[in-house]
């Protein structure tokens, strides 16, 4: 990737005001040796740092403190750049868009290293979400985030390929370090989604820029049923956690996966909890499982697989809801203990 950036940099009419920041997340290989060897043979401004706190979010936040530019580009180390990526990124930095826009979300296209399995379906209505394969491709036209997708979800930029003005971090905060790959909190995704959804709540303009393209390799191991189920489980787990904690905490019992238009008709009892888990999630798991069993007698394998993925996602939500309930109870008893120490008593039941 460094070679690609160096090659594209030489083609720019102006080669100033570009720096590369590499953050080594406490690796034990020869990463530092490779980087220093590359730095000696290029005119690019490359800064190399080590962040001991594990997690992609921690690395991003650390990189922000070391960056001197006004527009920061974030990409992963396992992607391939489109031949015009740096040129298009430089156009963003030059201010070819409204200066009020705080975030530009680029396109990420999966690079399939093997033909699709016969069972794998990417099309509606029972298609696997492209995010499973690190895809973020929504047409050739620029448009403002968030926008609705074919999956019925609100879409935000992907951390695989995104450009953020540095002042955003100064004014709005950083990525949550309990989310994302290798995060201490154990929630290995939605670190970028949570951050951009939060910016959307703050009315920060964000635009999808499809001309800034990266390609993400997809190995055969990523295209297995087990891996996709694992992805949906982690997604459901992180989705519920994000909705109930920290700066994104909303309705204490959101009906995740249900269109807001229909949430009002859900019976009140379904929003209550049974053993720390909303009854709605118990019901959701039950009915999905029943339908999945029925589909075993059907020839519609795409729907059967889709149902198994949704069951995995619901199981993740159930696990996260139990963790949230545990956290709430812990805070409740901690508050009670503080009152008791002060000689104040109350009925907490």
Roles of regions detected by a PLM:
Residues 51-67:
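Glycine-rich, basic loop-to-helix element that forms the pyrophosphate-binding segment
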Residues 206, 210-305:
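Active-site-adjacent helix/loop segment of glycosyltransferases
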Residues 1-10:
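Short, well-formed alpha-helical segments that are part of the catalytic scaffolds
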Residues 157-159, 181-195:
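Acidic donor-binding loop at a coil-to-helix junction in glycosyltransferase catalytic cores
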Residues 124-154:
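Short, flexible, basic/aromatic active-site loop/helix in glycosyltransferases
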Residues 24-33, 79:
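A conserved acidic beta->alpha catalytic loop
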Residues 72:
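Short aromatic/hydrophobic "clamp" motif used to bind/position activated sugar donors
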Residues 84-125:
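Conserved donor NDP-sugar-binding/catalytic core segment of glycosyltransferases
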